[in-house]
UniProtKB/Swiss-Prot annotation:
The keyword Glycosyltransferase applies. This is 1,4-alpha-glucan branching enzyme GlgB. One of its GO terms (cellular component) is cytosol. The keyword Transferase applies. The gene is glgB. Belongs to the glycosyl hydrolase 13 family. GlgB subfamily. Catalyzes the formation of the alpha-1,6-glucosidic linkages in glycogen by scission of a 1,4-alpha-linked oligosaccharide from growing alpha-1,4-glucan chains and the subsequent attachment of the oligosaccharide to the alpha-1,6 position. InterPro entries: A-amylase/branching_C (IPR006048), Branching_enzy (IPR037439), GlgB (IPR006407), GlgB_N (IPR054169), GlgB_N_E_set_prok (IPR044143), Glyco_hydro_13_cat_dom (IPR006047), Glyco_hydro_13_N (IPR004193), Glyco_hydro_b (IPR013780). Gene3D superfamilies: Glycosidases, Golgi alpha-mannosidase II, Immunoglobulins. It comes from Yersinia pestis. The lineage of its organism: Bacteria, Pseudomonadati, Pseudomonadota, Gammaproteobacteria, Enterobacterales. The active site is at residues 405, 458. GO terms for molecular function: 1,4-alpha-glucan branching enzyme activity; cation binding; hydrolase activity, hydrolyzing O-glycosyl compounds. Keywords: Carbohydrate metabolism, Glycogen biosynthesis, Glycogen metabolism, Glycosyltransferase, Transferase.
Amino acid sequence: MSVLPDRQVINQLISGHYGDPFSILGMHETSQGLQICALLPDAREVWLVETENGRRIAQLTLEDPRGFFIAQLTRRKKSFRYQFAVTWQENPQIIEDPYRFGPLLQDIDSWLLAEGTHLRPYERLGAHLMSLDGVSGVSFAVWAPNAQRVSVVGDFNFWDGRRHPMRLRRENGIWELFLPGIEAGQLYKFEIIDCHGQVRLKADPYAFEAQMRPETASLISPLPDVVKSSAARQKANDLCSPVSIYEVHLGSWRRHTDNNFWLSYRELADQLVEYVKYMGFTHVELLPINEHPFDGSWGYQPLGLYAPTRRYGTPEDFKAFVAKFHQAGINVILDWVPGHFPSDEHGLSTFDGTALYEYADPREGYHQDWNTLIYNYGRNEVRNYLAGNAFYWMERFGIDALRIDAVASMIYRDYSRAEGQWVPNYYGGRENLEAIAFLRYTNKTIGVERPGSVTMAEESTDFPGVTLPPDIGGLGFNYKWNMGWMHDTLNYMQCDPVHRKYHHNLMTFGMLYAYTENFILPLSHDEVVHGKRSILDRMPGDAWQKFANLRAYYAFMWAHPGKKLLFMGCEFAQGREWNFETSLDWHLLDDENGWHSGVQRLVRDLNHCYRQYAPLYEWDYQPAGFEWLVVDDHENSVFAFLRRDAEGHELIAISNFTPVPRYHYRVGIPQGGHYREVLNSDSAFYCGSNLGNQGGIDSHHVRSHNHEHSLLLTLPPLATIYLLREN
């Protein structure tokens, strides 16, 4: 009897509408022997070659002029390794048949991917250079359970979706194919016939490299090698360690002066690393470097979560960039965006014709503020895609920490939505229980699998337990940005000094909740855009007062409990708002004796002072590490507090937020002795008026502020001073 494929099936296969190509193509054992089918459009002649001896076994018959070939071997019953000798125009070419290879995905991987608990989904999905049965090539795998057909397309097959349709693993909705002869650097996409019969051309969600906008293809790129962590890097992230973060947008920190073009990862590795080290920061935080189609999103609308943007170079270049920071003793934090993604056609949107990665209901799946789509955290495969990506950056690039963007938008279903525009959870509440479960799982997994690596939450509400362990009901982050402290203190500093006495509580309120979370004090990129003005420009007064206010504020911040974060340009008091399309105003530092240089020197000294004196950081999250000395002097706008470390060392910070010098100002202290002035923001070195306490002062046995000892101080105008008790 005939075993020829049905004519309708052949037509569907040739037209690219057949979803089970492996049932037809390749070598099959039948009751009449072996049957070999191949779809090779434009081929003139095809021979079957036995790989073991190179002998031509049979010529395939052109069954359909559109390129469908078939051969019957009635004398052979068992399958064997083979190749095709194909004549396209003139010279024959020996090629491997992708359809002679068996399934790629192992059962355990299939199970874990479907369950959403595969630690490294990026090792199985996407495109992977490999050798299979002695043949070099690339294995492709993509999740598209509702697609009718999925093909790999690229330059290697003329972007023709008919040539390389994939195998569907029905148990998990993953399509897979091994393509021999494909090499690193080649472009590819997935051509999907979706559930509605529409053709969609999609970039690989798991691609390790992608084209830069406006191009949208993925690139074959090797999976980066594992980067081991180190004890020093782990300790640098610890709650008891000094953490001073320099936040950077790589595309606008510095640019080529001749053409305003970006610096490459390699150029940044030389210039930025040296600068961050010189300034004394312990960490650098990068605005998102995942591939993204829109420059104006600053990276916060990524589509290629697994691909470092090619704006600045290759994945290898970025890996070298991170390694250069590590060699300098600086930890690297990456801003990470698992909350939403843009709706660009080549991306995740309606990936297989359905709302696959996003929620189907726009009341859940559409973010009206940003015109983006929200991940469906209720799907195992989506959670796995995101959690695996977090681990990928840490394991494969050595990223030391992730700062998760816009956590509030993830955990609240009614975030920025009016009544009736959101869907309650199962219990009728406003919390997104699926997103909360995802964050807990991701944070816990990182803690177990990558000890010493940490996560930081930009969470703008009072959601309880952000930095508590998931086991006791927390979200499991290590740190949380203190948005309330930032807003309160900036609002205070914007007041004219004569009015500050009426807003005294803005500077003290933060200590009422300082120990509810592990806080970072952020002056981030969000505070110098969208008409908010620069930090310097928010300060009141004439030019001298603006700079003095800023110096006093920075010194107050560096002494206050909580880790520190400062956005680039703020360290030298850039006067304009941040513009992502140009370099920072480095020319402001041309005058070494100018005010901008003075602020830069202050920030550098603050960092070195902060790292040198343990009272400023060791007990950030212990109430015993802080004590108010002067908290209620509204009239003079003076604040004084003491910082203490585990060994009992003490440092006092005193701020005078008026332009009036305070002479003979008495401050009560717990212990008497000699106090050395280790920092004064009014120093002439920082372009201040150089008023102070002549380097140090002895205490008096005079009771004040409920203490038996006190200091009689000179408080410079609009300034903060640090006094270290010497043993």
